[in-house]
Amino acid sequence: MSSSNTPSSSAAAAGSIDSSAARRNSKRPKYSKFTQQELPACKPILTPGWVISTFLIISVIFIPLGVISLFASQDVVEIVDRYDSACIPLSDRANKVAYIQGTGNKSCTRTLIVPKRMKQPIYVYYQLENFYQNHRRYVKSRSDSQLRSVKDENQIDACKPEDDFGGQPIVPCGLIAWSLFNDTYVLSRNNQGLTVNKKGIAWKSDKEHKFGKNVFPKNFQKGNLTGGASLDPNKPLSDQEDLIVWMRTAALPTFRKLYGKIESDLEKGENIQVTLQNNYNTYSFSGKKKLVLSTTSWLGGKNDFLGIAYLTVGGICFVLALAFTVMYLVKPRRLGDPTYLSWNRIPGGR
């Protein structure tokens, strides 16, 4: 009885081994040089010639780019006028916050002198300093769905504390919209008005996709504490470009935002009179306000950093290339020389 069962049990065991081996083989991934990391690779040896040539090529590319970038930046004509302190009457400078929160006249006149001929278009910016739009609570205090669609005007959960007024939703809600910049500028030259075009200052993608054409302001700036500018309740949010520009928050505490464009040339030596309303409260957080008039170049606005960065990197690479060249010529070293091994250089070394 037992002898007759032995072959069958051994056959079953062999069958199970074969089936388990087949299962393992069926799950094995297809062999390829890519999955096994066996692709051919080139590993260049860093010989002195290669190192010197690399540094030299970088310097030859970067130094001219730095010079070109600096020249492009120097072609930009810029007028910057800080007015937050100058537009406070002497009698009120001891308590600037009380002045800016008062109801008195805050009109101020500034005179700007054009240093060089400025070709159109001339961009008018306002610049704020020490204003942290990147604060987490500030950045989150908005409702993108509410800005896009009138159906979502009640989506105000993220907008506290500027979410509703009298139980009705505020549109647009949140701290970003509530703190909308509200200083205004009226420019003139030779006693004639200088038109500042405020159309087309916002990104087209923001106007078309982030702010609805059928969404209108509601209950905006009706609270006890006014944060900034008011909005026209008869204009859809997609047409309120000052708001759209402001809602694109800045990453750094010093930033500029586009106010408008001057579409006529300004000649050297001309006096530009600016009548401004100093309404925006930057005094509570020791902020600064500046009015900026600027042209542009093919590289953008005035920014010396890019050119200086290119010149610095190119100069360092050139110095390193020169140093390695001198070392190679004065004290050359044969590649792969075993005398430089530690146990050959130091007696008894390991």
From Swiss-Prot:
Localization: Golgi apparatus membrane; Prevacuolar compartment membrane; Endoplasmic reticulum membrane
Keywords: Acetylation, Endoplasmic reticulum, Glycoprotein, Golgi apparatus, Membrane, Transmembrane, Transmembrane helix
InterPro entries tied to this protein: CDC50/LEM3_fam
UniProt-annotated glycosylation sites, renumbered to this chain: N105, N182, N224
A Pfam family this chain is assigned to: CDC50
Low complexity compositional bias, start-end: 1-22
Biological processes per GO annotation: phospholipid transport
Source domain of life: Eukaryota
Modified residues (N-acetylserine): S2
A single GO cellular-component term on record: endoplasmic reticulum membrane
Keyword Membrane: yes
UniProt keyword annotation of Membrane present: yes
Expression by tissue: Expressed in roots, leaves, stems, flowers and siliques. Found in petals and sepals, but not in reproductive tissues. In siliques, detected in the upper part of the seed pod and in the area between the seed pod and the stem, but not in developing seeds. Strong expression in vascular shoot tissues and in stomatal guard cells of young rosettes leaves. In roots, expressed in cells surrounding the xylem and in central and peripheral columella cells.
Primary site of residence: Golgi
Membrane topology: Multi-pass membrane protein
Function: Required for the lipid transport activity of the ALA/ALIS P4-ATPase complex.
Family: Belongs to the CDC50/LEM3 family.
Subunit annotation: Associates with ALA3 to form a stable complex. Interacts with ALA2 in a heterologous system.
Annotated protein name in UniProt: ALA-interacting subunit 1
Organism listed in the record: Arabidopsis thaliana (Mouse-ear cress)
